[in-house]
Structure formats: structure tokens, C-alpha cells
A protein has these predicted regions:
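N-terminal [4Fe-4S]-dependent radical SAM core
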Residues: 1-30, 48
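N-terminal start-of-chain detector that recognizes signal peptides
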Residues: 2-6, 51, 115-117, 174-175
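Short, flexible segments with low predicted structural confidence
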Residues: 12-16, 40, 136, 166-167
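Short secondary-structure boundary/capping elements
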Residues: 13, 25, 56-60, 124, ...
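Canonical Radical SAM [4Fe-4S] cluster-binding loop centered on the CxxxCxxC motif
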Residues: 23-57, 110
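Broad hydrophobic/π-residue packing in well-ordered secondary structure
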Residues: 25, 43-44, 61, 79, ...
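Conserved catalytic-core segments centered on acid/base and nucleophilic motifs
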Residues: 31-32, 43-44, 76-85, 99
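Conserved AdoMet/S-adenosylmethionine-binding subsite of the radical SAM
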Residues: 62-70, 76, 85-211
Length: 211
């Protein structure tokens, strides 16, 4: 590891099939869509590239489509980064157009913290909402969020979540267990109850993951 935290703590290199395209779990492929992010978390397990380097970033959508077609066991795509929601609507639409046309895929996921850190990107972008609504009719779209503390549940987040739900998007949350932030039962229970009350499903907790 160097001062930038370049060490690949999750062994992603071993699961990379070609630039920016990973196949670790049998049914899921993952795309590193961008190195940019709406936030720069100290606990990020991709410090080696987020906000720094494009050398691992996905560039070949047609190759991804061909790979999926050649692997019938794949039933979903996770578009990650960085944060894919910092990309333009045109790029997001292109992803959805290509992947929603594949009969073998049951759903498409976006890993994003934008609804938490930049909710206006969603709530005030009617074009994006219409794109999501359009393609959700073809394939179920999930947003996998990262809300780590009740204080992150702002009125703006609630508005953005509501508009996503109106488009038919399913919202799941992955919480990072953080010392001194949410590592006690009261805070964690409050967080899970509050996100459930606004239609966001508690999905899983990141714990003891090397960063």
C-alpha cells in the first residue's frame, strides 16, 4: 500500500475479465463505470482509483454485452464506480438501453450515494427520472444506496427517494459499520427503522472489510 491507499484490498484484479469489467459471483457482473464519486469516504475500499485514476475504468459496452451473452448464468449487472450517477444522462441511458435488451438479465443495479450526498441530481432532473421510468418497464432497476447514520436522512433525500419510487425503482441500503458513528444498537436500530419508513430496504451491513 502507498500513501494513496492503492492496495487492492478486495482482490478485484483477480475477478477482472477485461478493463473495468468484473465477474466474481456466478450470477453477477460488475462494471467500474467511472473513477469519480459524489463523495470521498475514508473507508472506501477502492481508494486506489476513486478520484485518482482512469486506468481501471470500463470503456467497452459492446464487449460487456457479448460477455454476458456468452455466460447464461449471469442474471444481473451491477453498475458501480466511483458513482455512476455522476455520469451524464446520455451515458446512463446507453447502459440501460444495452442491458435491458438482454433477455437473460432479471434486473439492473446501480451502486450510488448520490441520493444521499447530491439528491438534487435526482429530484430536480426530470430527464433522468423519465429515463429510469422508461427502462424500468423493461427490466427492474435497483438503486443500492449507502446511508450510514440517521443524520444523513435529509428532506432532500426523502424527496429523491420518493421520486425514484414513483418510477418503480427499488431502493436498498448497504450500511457501513463505522466505529464511533453507528457501532451501537440504538443508532443502528434508529437508522434501519427510519430508512424503512421512507421505503428504503435495509439490505446488508459492511463489517470487517479491509480498506
Amino acid at each position: 500500500m502507498n500513501i494513496l491507499g492503492s492496495y487492492d484490498t478486495s482482490g478485484e484484479k483477480h475477478n477482472t475479465k477485461f478493463l473495468g469489467f468484473q465477474h466474481k459471483y456466478r450470477q453477477t457482473v460488475l462494471i467500474l463505470s467511472t473513477q469519480q464519486c459524489a463523495s470521498y469516504c475514508r473507508f472506501c475500499f477502492r481508494k486506489r482509483l476513486v478520484g485518482i485514476s482512469k486506468k481501471e475504468i470500463f470503456t467497452n459496452l459492446e464487449k460487456a454485452v457479448d460477455y454476458i451473452k456468452d455466460h447464461p448464468e449471469v442474471n444481473n449487472v451491477l453498475i458501480s464506480g466511483g458513482d455512476p450517477l455522476v455520469l451524464s444522462n446520455r451515458v446512463l441511458k446507453n447502459f440501460l438501453e444495452k442491458f435491458s435488451s438482454l433477455p437473460q438479465l432479471d434486473f439492473i443495479r446501480f451502486g450510488t450515494k448520490v441520493p444521499v450526498y447530491h439528491p438534487e441530481r435526482i429530484a430536480q432532473d426530470e430527464e433522468l427520472l423519465q429515463i429510469l421510468k422508461q427502462y424500468n418497464r423493461k427490466k427492474q432497476i435497483y438503486f443500492v444506496l449507502q446511508i450510514d447514520h440517521p443524520n444523513e436522512i435529509s428532506p432532500e433525500l426523502i424527496e429523491a427517494a420518493g421520486k425514484l419510487k414513483q418510477c418503480g425503482i427499488i431502493l436498498n441500503n448497504q450500511t457501513v459499520l463505522l466505529k464511533g458513528v453507528n457501532d451501537n444498537p440504538e443508532v443502528m436500530a434508529k437508522l434501519q427503522n427510519q430508512i424503512t419508513s421512507i421505503g428504503i430496504n435495509p439490505y446488508y451491513v459492511f463489517q470487517c472489510r479491509p480498506v
